[in-house]
Amino acid sequence: MPFLWGLRQDKEACVGTNNQSYICDTGHCCGQSQCCNYYYELWWFWLVWTVVIILSCCCVCHHRRAKHRLQAQQRQHEINLIAYREAHNYSALPFYFRFLPNSLLPPYEEVVNRPPTPPPPYSAFQLQQQQQLLPPPPQGGPPGGSPPGADPPPQGSQGAQSSPLSGPSRSSTRPPSVADPQSPEVPTDREATKASGTESGSPMAGHGELDPGAFLDQDSECKEELLKDSRSERGGVSPDSEDKTPGRHRRFTGDSGIEVCVCNRGHHDDDLKEFNTLIDDALDGPLDFCDSCHVRPPVDEEEGLCLSSEGQAREHGHPHLPRPPACLLLNTINEQDSPNSQHSGSPS
């Protein structure tokens, strides 16, 4: 720098008046006997300029910050003023909103703790379906009873009515992905069996009493129907459903397992013996038998609707008449199709 450069200069010898020489320690020779220095050679000159520059930068920064702060305050003041004017001028709803509150939803705070109506029970939809499927009462008589000269309705027909009602309602509760496919011959066989059960129940009701021989006939019909159903399923369904056997009752236990029992009606004929051997060969071991097909197991998800239909039949019928055995066809579920089999590796 210039002032350091001046400090590094050697002493300069000057010639004064009368040819007298003198030496300048700093600066240069000027005049007769003086030593002078330039302004950029002075140290305080550069110090002053440095301080001036620093102060100028500080002033500029402070001015810009104050300007930005003032602009922000002005914008906030304008926003507050606009909001105050809007709230003051439009305290009521606008004209095009005054006719809408009746059609708008209520606020959330008004209905969060005060529902207007409780949810309908789960059995309401099932009862409505059953009422739609029931035949209408006769026009001449009262809706709740029968004409004075007519015979009481047979209990067998009521059982035949309750069993087809429980079938669609139970199948409606099951998801379509879990339902197993069936051959087209099965529904026709079931309809024929139901029609024969209804026809056989009407003459028994005409005599006024039910004989035990009719019960045995219906038991044999149920067994034949179950065997026919199993044969048709084995002939027309995919190989995945070949393990289905007639009379098997499956119930999900809730712990990813299925309890299986065989309908044991107390008759040991050739069909049941052959049926037992088939089950032992298919399942590699003996299988538990149910106590009775007429004793209902604990109600599960698939058979929960049967109780409501039977209760209605008891209300409309006569309790003193014995109830004929109703042939219930249970739609079993393949272990491969059930969602629990994907997580559990052990066979059911």
UniProtKB/Swiss-Prot annotation:
Keywords: Membrane, Phosphoprotein, Transmembrane, Transmembrane helix. Residues 111-253, 306-348 are annotated as: Disordered. Residues 331-348 have a biased composition (Polar residues). The keyword Membrane applies. It holds the Pfam family WBP-1. One of its GO terms (biological process) is positive regulation of protein ubiquitination. Residues 156-177 have a biased composition (Low complexity). It is found in: Membrane. InterPro entries: WBP1-like (IPR021684), WW_domain-binding (IPR051994). The chain crosses the membrane at residues 42-62. It is a single-pass membrane protein. One of its GO terms (cellular component) is membrane. It comes from the Eukaryota. Residues 220-234 have a biased composition (Basic and acidic residues). Residues 134-155 have a biased composition (Pro residues). The modification Phosphoserine is found at residue 177. This is WW domain binding protein 1-like. It comes from Mus musculus (Mouse). The lineage of its organism: Eukaryota, Metazoa, Chordata, Craniata, Vertebrata.
